[in-house]
């Protein structure tokens, strides 16, 4: 254990002026290196978490938390499925849907996901009505064959509200000239913008009854669910499938977008590993400064040994002194990281206004600010990692100090 004498001497060495000013400089560089590494790591991981949260929130504005769909055939009794889902207190809303891959033709062609909805039930599972820039969800009336397009999709197709688009579905039909894809001309009645390119450029929405007629389908693809807690999506969907007592397929938002979330998680992990090298550099500087301090304090060590301080006691002195440098650097970095994260948006705006530049163009990143989401577990892990690195960095110099023989050290004094 660290006895009071070791702590007292370690604190004295931390505050005392060195005969060699370079040692003081290296010690200060160690503190700054550790503090900088911790600050940058906390801020970067907060930004990465913020981007993950922003993407997830924008994606789930239009995507269901969970889906239950029929296996190999349409779901016919969807009214019963919706009613049964709403009896679960974990479910906030449920609505039927039809989905099919389609090719949309305007001035140009673009593949997209075609989704058939019930307009007066869609607000239970998505915010489509709030994301419409032009038009209304009420324009999707049965038999009128109107269509809502993502803003980017409409721009690519070269169409606007009032224009027509031809929809070719993946299902085929037999005609006198052979097998042809099912097609229908729809009128663009609205444009929506979620702020997520995969949706704004890859989704088209029509009335469910219109889509049933085009596809010659008397049922639906399945039921979409919105939950009070999206983390329970899989359990809720699975329970509903069991209660429906049929061959149903269950999916949730984590499985539908597994590649996206795994890549975001990997990016955060890799970024954390790379930036932790800054802390490692600070710890390496700590080793250098401690080794030079041991050399500078050889006479003091010899006197302490002569007065009865054991080699283990000498080792503890320098471990305390080095660990305190690590603690100061780590705590400074944590404070700096928290303050920087909280004020990052203001700093970004200040830089943009000062230099008259746009760091995050909205047309490229679909955001005007820098989202941050500081996670307490991330801060704890970074803090512990910095403290452990600092402690490990003190071991070798302290061990060297403990090996110094008093007679050898005092011979040249």
From Swiss-Prot:
Pfam families: FtsX (PF02687), MacB_PCD (PF12704). It comes from the Bacteria. It is a multi-pass membrane protein. Its main location: membrane. GO terms for cellular component: plasma membrane protein complex. One of its GO terms (biological process) is lipoprotein localization to outer membrane. Keywords: Cell inner membrane, Cell membrane, Membrane, Transmembrane, Transmembrane helix, Transport. It is found in: Cell inner membrane. InterPro entries: ABC3_permease_C, Lipoprotein-release_system, LolCE_TM, MacB_PCD. The chain crosses the membrane at residues 22-42, 269-289, 322-342, 379-399. Belongs to the ABC-4 integral membrane protein family. LolC/E subfamily. This is Lipoprotein-releasing system transmembrane protein LolC.
